[in-house]
UniProtKB/Swiss-Prot annotation:
Residues 102-337 form the Radical SAM core domain. NCBIfam families: rRNA_mod_RlmN (TIGR00048). CDD domains: Radical_SAM. Belongs to the radical SAM superfamily. RlmN family. Disulfide bonds join C109-C342. The keyword rRNA-binding does not apply. GO terms for molecular function: 4 iron, 4 sulfur cluster binding; metal ion binding; rRNA (adenine(2503)-C2-)-methyltransferase activity; rRNA binding; tRNA (adenine(37)-C2)-methyltransferase activity; tRNA binding. It catalyses: adenosine(2503) in 23S rRNA + 2 reduced [2Fe-2S]-[ferredoxin] + 2 S-adenosyl-L-methionine = 2-methyladenosine(2503) in 23S rRNA + 5'-deoxyadenosine + L-methionine + 2 oxidized [2Fe-2S]-[ferredoxin] + S-adenosyl-L-homocysteine; adenosine(37) in tRNA + 2 reduced [2Fe-2S]-[ferredoxin] + 2 S-adenosyl-L-methionine = 2-methyladenosine(37) in tRNA + 5'-deoxyadenosine + L-methionine + 2 oxidized [2Fe-2S]-[ferredoxin] + S-adenosyl-L-homocysteine. Keywords: 4Fe-4S, Cytoplasm, Disulfide bond, Iron, Iron-sulfur, Metal-binding, Methyltransferase, rRNA processing, S-adenosyl-L-methionine, Transferase, tRNA processing. Gene3D superfamilies: 1.10.150.530, Aldolase class I. Its EC number is 2.1.1.192. It is found in: Cytoplasm. This is Dual-specificity RNA methyltransferase RlmN.
Length: 367
């Protein structure tokens, strides 16, 4: 029995016409039920004949991640602990913002692996180690769960507006499933997210970088976090196997759309990478390409030997970058009180949570 959410549209159409003997238009109907109408069962597909629904139910299943816990931060950030079909546990986060019209909008942070192989020394997920890659169905299942939780069931996504592959895992080490996910996200009859609303963040993996760029399916963000090879090798030992010089050389030829820039994420670690000398090196580095910088203040994580810089050092770092015509924005941290902020996603407590019943706080109304 196949997991039907794991099929791209072309695969679904080929399977339904070939294996089930259905006309092509049936595949389009089923596809829209799966991705636009949040159908959890074939019985819900009311414009599909009963006979076809019965054949579908005999040959396929619709498997969503199981919600184990839902935690809501004082700032409105929502963190889901999800169990996959084999019992593996992952997290996804909804980060709120307010539109110019005063309406609540959400950015969803997606995981793409169970654990992470990169082992970055400042990241809680990195301390978990790597278990396995997630499938397309598991990656996009996070979106389905969040949309259902928020009542966001319209194709124009009035609530969940942006998606960022910045959760657990390194996307370019799960390139095949991430690319399949991006195509389904972009499909106008699927989840229907514009590429301009999707960002894929990578530590800088040579394999896959060019393919992602040429696809045009998402914006690129690079987890840089260091202005030189020595610091990067110390805090990101596995990512540093590909040197900063090689990374920047690849990014110099990365295909960008008009007015598009590469976002560099830079985590400010007190006494490690936050001096003016570091800022000076950083300017020289990122000036090699069209760039903007997201400055992220370190979020404390249990067992990790780092601290946030002082506010004075943070502002001095930012001001130096601006003085050299480098766009730099200090990203406001959200969800710290529920361990949902950058670098805090971790399934270390997941074994004890595995048997926990669903815990969900009252939903907040979104305008």
């Amino acid at each position: 029995m196949i997991d039907i959410l794991n099929l791209t549209y072309d695969e679904l159409e080929a399977w339904m016409t070939g294996t089930l003997g259905e006309p092509r238009f049936r595949a389009r109907q089923v596809w829209q039920w799966l991705w636009q109408k949040n159908a959890r069962s074939f019985d819900a597909m009311t414009n599909v004949s009963k006979a076809t629904r019965a054949r579908l139910a005999e040959a396929a299943r619709i498997t969503w991640p199981e919600v184990r816990t839902v935690k809501t931060s004082s700032d409105g950030t929502v963190k889901f602990l999800l169990a996959l079909a084999d019992g593996a546990l992952v997290e996804t986060v909804l980060i709120p913002s307010e539109s110019r019209e005063g309406k609540v909008r959400m950015t969803q942070c997606l995981s793409c692996q169970v654990g992470c192989a990169m082992g970055c020394t400042f990241c809680s997920t990195g301390s978990m180690g790597f278990e396995r890659n997630m499938t397309m169905a598991e990656i996009l299942g996070q979106v389905l769960v969040a949309r259902e939780h928020l009542g966001d069931d319209r194709p124009d996504h009035p609530i969940v507006r942006n998606l960022v592959f910045m959760g657990m895992g390194e996307p370019l080490l799960n390139l095949n499933e991430v690319m399949r996910s991006l195509r389904t996200l972009n499909d106008e009859f699927g989840l229907c997210f514009s590429p301009r609303r999707i960002t894929v963040s990578t530590c800088g993996i040579e394999k896959g970088l060019r393919e992602l760029g040429e696809s045009g399916l998402a914006f690129l963000a690079v987890s840089l976090h260091a202005p030189n090879q020595e610091v990067r090798a110390r805090i990101m030992p596995r990512a540093a196997r590909w040197t900063l010089d090689d990374l920047m050389a690849a990014l110099e030829s990365y295909p960008l759309k008009t007015r598009e820039r590469i976002t560099f994420e830079y985590l400010l670690l007190g006494g490690v990478n936050d001096s003016i000398d570091h800022a000076r090196e950083l300017v020289r580095l990122v000036s090699r390409t069209k760039a903007k910088l997201n400055l992220i203040v370190y979020n404390p994580a249990e067992g990790l030997p780092y601290e946030a810089p002082s506010q004075a050092r943070i502002l001095a770092f930012e001001q130096y970058l601006w003085s050299k015509n480098v766009t730099a924005i200090i990203r406001k941290s959200k969800g710290q009180d529920i361990k949902a902020a950058c670098g805090q996603l971790k399934a270390s407590e997941l074994a004890e949570l595995a048997g926990m019943a669903v815990t969900e706080e009252p939903k907040k109304e979104a305008e």
